[in-house]
Amino acid sequence: MLFRSSAYDIKYITGVELNISFSHPRYRNSKPVSLDMLGYQYDIHNQELIKKLKQVSEYRRKRAEQILEKINDELTKEHLKAFTHQDLEAIEETVDGAFGRPHIANYMVKKGIVSNKQKAFDKYLVKCNVPKMPVSLEEASKLIRGAGGKLVHAHPSDPNGTSLVSLTPSIHEQHKIIKESMLPWLDGIECWHTRHNPETISAHLAFAKKEGLLVTGGSDCHQQPIIMGTLDIPAYVAEQFNL
């Protein structure tokens, strides 16, 4: 991809998504929640970042195996056929990017175990979940900044995703959390997102301007039904990266 970009004189920004574990003393009795962070414009040859991403990738596969083992326990109780190693390999063949529960859900639909992805989560994947590899906000920031990049808080108000909504639905409270506990490690905030409404976008833009943060946006297109390129993001967002 980078070679083709250079060959056709296309400007690009390197990017990676990192999942972190975050807790706040005022919410959920300090129980940690999962949040997504975005690293932009980093050196893809940075060895520390490469090493960590490899560890995360290897952990994801082990996590998937553990989730399937738990699902097998449930399937056995229901007198249904358990997943095999061949099933795991078949799921892996469908993965384009990071291996996660949505890929298992899709496979369960394909095998006729459930009628749709949501039922896969409701009946099996929530109950059989295994925690993701714990990475702190500080560690993620040091990795990305150490590679010359910028760390951005992904979709902070996504009602359906790994976001601050897990702590509070109030955007005002979300901004308070960011200001109190996250600002030293953040360079920006993702304002435009498929599940951010106009009011949410405006609130995040105002907050970012006040705190001197970069503003970014993305469709969060990991798979269907979300389509890449369907979100209208101003050109000045890319210009912030001095391309």
Model-derived segments and spans:
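Acidic-and-aromatic substrate-binding clefts and catalytic sites of carbohydrate-active enzymes
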Residues: 1, 129-133, 159-169, 192-200
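Short beta-strands and strand-loop turn motifs
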Residues: 122, 153-156, 187-191
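Short, structured patches in soluble enzyme cores that scaffold and shape functional sites
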Residues: 39-41, 108, 155
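Conserved, well-ordered alpha-helix/loop/beta-strand core segments that scaffold catalytic motifs
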Residues: 133-179
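Structural recognition of alpha->loop->beta junctions
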Residues: 172-190, 230-243
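A metal-dependent hydrolase metal-coordination microenvironment
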Residues: 1-96, 184, 190-234
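Hydrophobic, aromatic-enriched interface-forming segments
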Residues: 68-143
